[in-house]
């Protein structure tokens, strides 16, 4: 597939596959020597912080969106407990941490819905769970958790844009840097151009 992309002279590549396939595509970008100046890569998913060097080289300079977790005592405590459980420090800019925080709140959302159903002496079934989820509103570790009216989208969930900037000083962990965000009140995308590293960067 990437061979066809190379032959076609395509330089702006959007990857919308799940993480495992995204990793394979970045490996293919590396294999075909496509990570070089003049190219731009965008993906729907962040790669893990401990991917192979070939994948990191192939994905250097790519952009990926992720939830922006607001600072709070709950988030700090969650990080502390998670670090104690894993017996290692946690990078709050990693996809693993962000996904963990969101997943925790997803489980709590279902728990809140079930509790509300029981408090109202209703039957716990699929229909009622969905009905009550649409009315949930609680302070989670990823921020205030509620759904936008008439949709399944999280209300007021800030989004940031990460840029893969190679490895951190340890030479083993991918260095994802937040270079922009979408303002929740206006939908405006704010980008810090000076913080971006592009594909083919010579200082990798």
Question: What are these model-derived regions, one by one?
Answer:
Residues 29-107, 114-128:
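Extracellular/periplasmic periplasmic-binding protein-like sensory domains
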Residues 82-191:
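Segments of small-molecule ligand-sensing domains
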Residues 11-32, 106-109, 116:
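Hydrophobic alpha-helical
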Residues 1-9, 31:
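Short, well-structured alpha-helical segments in soluble
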Residues 3, 15-18, 96-103:
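Amphipathic alpha-helical protein-protein interaction segments
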Residues 10-11, 36-39, 54-60, 142, ...:
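Active-site lining segments that contact anionic ligands and/or coordinate catalytic metals
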Residues 185-204:
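Extracellular/luminal ectodomains of metazoan preproproteins built from arrays
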């Amino acid at each position: 597939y990437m061979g066809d992309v190379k032959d076609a002279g395509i330089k702006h590549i959007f990857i919308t596959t799940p993480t495992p396939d995204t990793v394979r595509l970045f490996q293919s970008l590396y294999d075909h020597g496509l990570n070089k100046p003049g190219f731009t890569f965008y993906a729907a998913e962040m790669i893990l912080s401990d991917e192979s060097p070939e994948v990191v080289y192939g994905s250097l300079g790519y952009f990926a969106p992720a939830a922006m977790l607001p600072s709070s005592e709950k988030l700090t405590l969650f990080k502390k407990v998670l670090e104690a459980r894993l017996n290692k420090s946690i990078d709050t800019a990693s996809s693993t941490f962000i996904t963990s925080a969101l997943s925790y709140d997803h489980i709590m959302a279902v728990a809140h819905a079930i509790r509300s159903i029981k408090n109202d002496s209703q039957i716990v079934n699929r229909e009622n769970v969905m009905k009550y989820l649409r009315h949930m509103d609680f302070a989670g570790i990823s921020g205030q958790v509620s759904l936008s009216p008439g949709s399944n989208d999280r209300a007021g969930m800030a989004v940031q844009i990460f840029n893969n900037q190679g490895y951190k000083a340890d030479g083993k962990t991918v260095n994802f840097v937040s270079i922009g965000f979408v303002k929740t009140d206006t939908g405006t995308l704010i980008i810090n151009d000076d913080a971006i590293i592009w594909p083919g960067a010579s200082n990798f």
